[in-house]
From Swiss-Prot:
InterPro entries: 2Fe-2S_ferredoxin-like_sf (IPR036010), 2Fe-2S_ferredoxin-type (IPR001041), 2Fe2S_fd_BS (IPR006058), Beta-grasp_dom_sf (IPR012675)
One Pfam family in the UniProt entry: Fer2
Domain 2Fe-2S ferredoxin-type span(s) in chain numbering: 2-84
GO MF terms held by the record: 2 iron, 2 sulfur cluster binding; electron transfer activity; metal ion binding
Protein name: Uncharacterized ferredoxin-like protein YfaE
Cellular component aspect of the GO annotation: cytoplasm
Binding-site residues, [2Fe-2S] cluster: C37, C42, C45, C74
Gene3D superfamilies: 3.10.20.30
Organism: Escherichia coli (strain K12)
Any single GO BP term: protein repair
Manner of cofactor binding, per the entry note: Binds 1 [2Fe-2S] cluster.
Top-level division of the source organism's lineage: Bacteria
Length: 84
């Protein structure tokens, strides 16, 4: 179980092992995340990873800068902080 901190609000959420992605974990806590494809193609869910690391479920096809993640195709690897 990983703790996700949302930097803008300071809210802390727990990611359960049954969440298939970080996006699913955020949605389970009623965090509104913009998305379209849910598979790493469009980049709509792009956000900045402030602290920690993620495991990629699938290699994102959308262009991301260093320090950015796509919550739809990754999972938290331990505690993380994201720019939301």
């Amino acid at each position: 179980m990983a703790r996700v901190t949302l930097r803008i609000t300071g809210t802390q959420l727990l990611c359960q092992d049954e969440h298939p992605s970080l996006l699913a974990a955020l949605e389970s806590h009623n965090v509104a995340v913009e998305y379209q494809c849910r598979e790493g193609y469009c980049g709509s869910c792009r956000t900045r990873l402030v602290a920690g690391q993620v495991d990629w479920i699938a290699e994102p096809l959308a262009f991301i800068q260093p320090g950015e993640i796509l919550p739809c195709c990754c999972r938290a690897k331990g505690d993380i902080e994201i720019e939301m």
